[in-house]
């Protein structure tokens, strides 16, 4: 029979031992719900390999922009060939009012809205459920905290889901190639979204999927 929920799907993929050690606690922290109440397709997106390849993606070449994505976008906006042709407005709420939306819509033939679909329709069918994330950032007086950019904490007892050590996204060196004497870490806490919070990702269960389909 087909797995009916995430727990059954995970056990069928990796067995009970790995499920209990690596998946159950982390998943329930991330989603705030028991694994047997989450749909099976959530776990299907994760690659399962019986090799030493620890990459998430299968692409031959993988990387991040040098200096980060903020610098990449800034360079694109400052390109001499595009200078003056790209207007950037910050702190603008597209949905603040009908007049604001109409004014912004008039700026282009096509508008791409990347916000929440229920907010776009003014919650006429009700609120979708989301998860939010809180970051606790700390500067440590050590050149190395965990030796890796991201370490997941898969147990249920640790309140954070993972710790990011930012320097390792840039190989831990300064502009001269020297080791950095300090390091910055961020603990990541997953939490239930409420109005006023930033929604990071939707809750992909049957109830929310049905409401999302109505909004579409």
Place the predicted regions along the sequence by residue:
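Active-site/ligand-binding neighborhood in enzyme catalytic cores
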Residues: 1-109
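Mid-domain catalytic core of redox enzymes
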Residues: 92-215
């Amino acid at each position: 029979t087909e797995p009916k929920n995430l727990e059954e799907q995970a056990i069928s993929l990796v067995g009970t031992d790995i499920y209990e050690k690596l998946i159950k606690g982390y998943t329930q922290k991330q989603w705030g719900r028991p694994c047997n109440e989450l749909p099976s397709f959530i776990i299907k997106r994760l690659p399962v390999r019986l090799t030493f390849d620890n990459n998430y993606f299968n692409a031959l070449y993988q990387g991040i922009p040098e200096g980060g994505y903020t610098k990449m976008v800034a360079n694109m906006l400052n390109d001499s060939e595009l200078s003056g042709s790209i207007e950037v407005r910050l702190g603008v709420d597209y949905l603040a009012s009908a007049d604001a939306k109409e004014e912004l819509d008039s700026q282009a033939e096509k508008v791409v809205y990347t916000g929440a679909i229920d907010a776009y329709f003014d919650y006429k069918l009700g609120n979708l459920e989301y998860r939010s994330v809180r970051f606790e950032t700390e500067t440590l007086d050590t050149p190395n905290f965990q030796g890796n950019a991201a370490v997941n904490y898969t147990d249920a007892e640790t309140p954070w889901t993972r710790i990011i050590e930012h320097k390792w996204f840039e190989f831990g060196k300064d502009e001269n190639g020297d080791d950095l004497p300090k390091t910055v870490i961020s603990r990541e806490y997953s939490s239930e979204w409420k109005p006023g919070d930033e929604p990071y990702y939707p809750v992909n269960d049957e109830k929310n999927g049905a409401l999302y389909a109505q909004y579409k």
